[in-house]
């Protein structure tokens, strides 16, 4: 098991039970899944870009992504319904905990001029979304072999019922939030 899942089981559950006075351990919020989404809008002109994005996301996540398709046609963007426009991966279980551990301990410290994530990125139900500007912050990506720098969205889905519970869960797992001044 990943070391963060052990920390969650041994320390975080008890801390959150005391903080929110839950009656059962099953009420304590948990990370349900992590979704990595990479949109590749330039696939209209070059089909190879999507293959490179899939390869990057496979290296980052450790599993093969699915290709996302356009839900409707938009003439100004030159896309049609069903046209491939990106890729995404949903991580659960052991891979999710390993990715979350890698994200906190290796990837986030490699972001230039990083001062912490804003707490305003919660969605109202305890889920948190991050936008990563460049994929080269991940150690699996070789800078010399990428065709172009592209970003991705990372969504951490929790079983929390509110933003306060989600914030408490991620803070207890040492997620780097910005300190309000």
Curated annotation (Swiss-Prot):
Role: This is one of the proteins that bind and probably mediate the attachment of the 5S RNA into the large ribosomal subunit, where it forms part of the central protuberance. In the 70S ribosome it contacts protein S13 of the 30S subunit (bridge B1b), connecting the 2 subunits; this bridge is implicated in subunit movement. Contacts the P site tRNA; the 5S rRNA and some of its associated proteins might help stabilize positioning of ribosome-bound tRNAs.
GO terms (BP aspect): translation
Gene name per UniProt: rplE
Name this protein carries in UniProt: Large ribosomal subunit protein uL5
InterPro entries, per database record: Ribosomal_uL5, Ribosomal_uL5_bac-type, Ribosomal_uL5_C, Ribosomal_uL5_CS, Ribosomal_uL5_dom_sf, Ribosomal_uL5_N
Keyword terms: Ribonucleoprotein, Ribosomal protein, RNA-binding, rRNA-binding, tRNA-binding
Family annotation (SUPFAM superfamilies): RL5-like
GO molecular function: rRNA binding; structural constituent of ribosome; tRNA binding
Cellular component GO terms held in the UniProt record: ribonucleoprotein complex; ribosome
Organism of this sequence: Baumannia cicadellinicola subsp. Homalodisca coagulata
Subunit structure: Part of the 50S ribosomal subunit; part of the 5S rRNA/L5/L18/L25 subcomplex. Contacts the 5S rRNA and the P site tRNA. Forms a bridge to the 30S subunit in the 70S ribosome.
Family: Belongs to the universal ribosomal protein uL5 family.
